Regions:
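N-terminal helical cap/lid subdomain that shapes the substrate entry/recognition surface
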Residues: 4-119, 124-127, 131-132
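Asp-based, Mg2+/Mn2+-dependent phosphohydrolase catalytic module
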Residues: 1-11, 23, 42, 46-52, ...
Length: 253
């Protein structure tokens, strides 16, 4: 008689504050991005574009991004990094038809943030999941294309663990919109009921996972204080290592 399939076949993760520890850095996003934006500014200047004052250009860009995220929350249509840059370029009269956006994104030179680290148990958990033959996915509400976030994953040594990696910026919808979960499940060839989703934001990660029918696990480390309100995860963990015995119990029914 053939073996029965495992009740849980795949584990999907959020990235920031789930696999990566951003504690103490959440309010430094502008400062973290500033040196990269300066590199983009230098690239545009070298290409012969007439640019405004560097500080004015930068602060305008972050206003564009803030407004884009506020708009996105109305229907969970994703913010797209290249589009926010183009919006800011247009505000200052730059001819976007003369800007090679792929080259501009590379000029931004995105890298892993030195102050951001893996959680202590990220690699041991991913190692165990791989050894136990789970399919592993990643879904992040990032406006950047996945190739830019891959730079971080490669730097942290975890890129090769994932069978599927998606950013909302690439897909066009952000969590909790069902489309981004459904895309990941389709690529993994796994039904929602046979997959676990682990994330730190109840209103995004957990609400979306619940709506699609995934087993939802809220990652709630001590430094995070997201309001759960009326959103109920199936399980709550405070560190990634707690996921392994939880999966074992799900497999054993």
């Amino acid at each position: 008689m053939s073996a029965q399939p495992k009740p849980i076949q795949a584990v999907l993760f959020d990235l920031d504050d789930t696999l990566l520890d951003w504690s103490g850095q959440q309010n430094r996003i502008a400062a973290i991005n500033r040196p990269h934006f300066d590199k983009l500014y230098g690239y545009l200047a070298a290409e012969g574009h007439s640019l405004p004052d560097r500080d004015v250009f930068f602060h305008s860009y972050f206003d564009v991004v803030k407004n884009a995220w506020n708009e996105a929350k109305k229907d969970w249509t994703a913010v797209n990094f290249a589009q926010t840059l183009q919006t800011n370029f247009t505000l200052f009269g730059l001819d976007i038809t003369r800007i090679d956006m792929e080259a501009a994104l590379h000029a931004y030179d995105w890298q892993a943030t030195p102050e951001v680290t893996l959680y202590q148990d990220t690699i041991p958990v991913l190692d165990t999941l791989r050894r136990q033959q789970y399919k592993i996915g990643l879904i992040t509400n990032s406006m950047m294309p996945m190739w830019m976030r891959d730079i971080e994953l490669r730097a942290y040594g975890i890129l090769d663990y994932f069978d599927v990696r998606l950013t909302s910026g690439d897909i066009g919808f952000m969590k909790p919109h069902p489309a981004i979960y459904e895309q990941a499940l389709s690529l993994l060839h796994v039904d929602a009921a046979r997959a676990v989703f682990v994330g730190d934001r109840p209103a995004n990660d957990i609400a979306g996972a619940n709506a699609v029918g995934l087993v939802s696990v809220l990652m709630s480390p001590p430094h995070l204080h997201h309001e759960i309100e009326d959103i109920q995860p199936d399980f709550i963990i405070t560190q990634l290592g707690e996921l392994l015995p939880l999966l074992e119990s799900l497999q054993n029914g």
